[in-house]
């Protein structure tokens, strides 16, 4: 699974499209901002995993994820950025865990990465709809 995540986050198949739109991986374009988002994602995963084990209420987790998605959306992050962030955090958090704990962490991570991706899509959809719904200023007569 780890190798597949790495392949997905580094797949060169979309490099041409990314260059066309002047988009690069967030970790390369702005390493410090990527690191901040990655740290927030790590906090979210830690909290989600803790809540799984101790049945917390998840309210604080929602706040962390919402802030993370707003940041990622504002930075123009894409799916590969989210997968790269997820892969790095999962690798760091899995060190020193038993196989059973690592499996539970990966499972919780799958839910989290899908949730973040879905919310990021919603963020972009809302942004696009806001542009479409925005009133256009009247044109001046020639």
Predicted segments, located by residue:
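Non-catalytic regulatory/interaction regions at protein termini and inter-domain linkers
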Residues: 1-142
